[in-house]
């Protein structure tokens, strides 16, 4: 049996990646619970993302602990990605079947594309974290240990989250200048990560941008909580205002992706040192 070094940089990176996946899955769990409750769970399949994200949170909590998550981990990560992919299909179908099809109005008010896509990311990153934690540095020709593929995938995930935030903040007419923060800072972070993936070099600027992106997720949740409080009745009327106000669960996805990006940076630093 392969011996797992629980103090190696690779294991530390696996913990960061798994921790980021926990945050993404937590965001999906809270968001899908609220939105599918709003839809009265009209389709029995609407329960699936709640179950998949809950299992993903539990399994990813063991990230970096070698085999402590057991052989169940790969199956749970695959299931999360599969449920997310199916949900993405359902949501796209829901948008296209509306009058006018793929219009801004339908993208604004119909089933969000970003939520199931985030579950795909949680499953994917969870799987990568597990492979690294058990000493598997590659998937076929893809070298996970270098951190470059992980950085590229994280940059893609950040830009997808930026697109979702941009769409919904555009719906809100960017009435608060702070609504530009999750568009600008994470975009710079994604660009820096993409460059690092191409050159195999990150640096302090990329790390600083990732830290800023993580902070944007936390600050965004606070702004959204304030937005909920501004609705009639404030937090005393939380049952209605949580559904009507800005989603509390959305911004922390930036934090999760930024933490995963830091894991990729750690792998690249280790690879550069040989």
Task: Set out the residue ranges of the language-model regions.
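Short amphipathic, positively biased membrane-proximal segments
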Residues: 1-274
């Amino acid at each position: 049996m392969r011996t797992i070094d629980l103090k190696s940089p690779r294991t530390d990176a696996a913990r960061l990646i798994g921790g980021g996946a926990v945050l993404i899955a937590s965001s999906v769990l809270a968001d899908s619970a609220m939105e599918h409750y709003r839809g009265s769970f009209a389709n029995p399949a609407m329960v699936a993302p709640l179950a998949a994200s809950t299992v993903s949170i539990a399994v990813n909590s063991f990230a970096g602990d070698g085999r402590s998550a057991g052989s169940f981990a790969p199956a749970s990560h695959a299931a999360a990605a599969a449920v997310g992919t199916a949900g993405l299909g359902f949501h796209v179908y829901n948008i296209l079947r509306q009058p006018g099809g793929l219009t801004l109005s339908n993208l604004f008010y119909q089933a969000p594309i970003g939520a199931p896509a985030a579950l795909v990311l949680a499953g994917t990153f969870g799987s990568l974290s597990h492979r690294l934690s058990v000493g598997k540095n590659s998937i076929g020709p893809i070298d996970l240990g270098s951190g470059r593929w992980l950085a590229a995938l994280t940059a893609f995930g950040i830009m997808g989250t930026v697109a979702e935030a941009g769409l919904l903040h555009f719906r809100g007419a960017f009435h608060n200048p702070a609504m530009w923060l999750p568009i600008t800072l994470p975009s710079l972070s994604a660009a820096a990560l993409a460059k690092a993936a191409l050159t195999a070099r990150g640096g302090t600027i990329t790390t600083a941008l990732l830290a800023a992106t993580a902070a944007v997720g936390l600050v965004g949740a606070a702004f959204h909580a304030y937005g909920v409080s501004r609705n009639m009745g404030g937090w005393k009327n939380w049952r209605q205002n949580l559904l009507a106000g800005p989603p509390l669960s959305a911004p922390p996805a930036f934090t999760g992706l930024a933490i995963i990006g830091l894991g990729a940076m750690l792998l690249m630093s280790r690879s550069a040192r040989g």
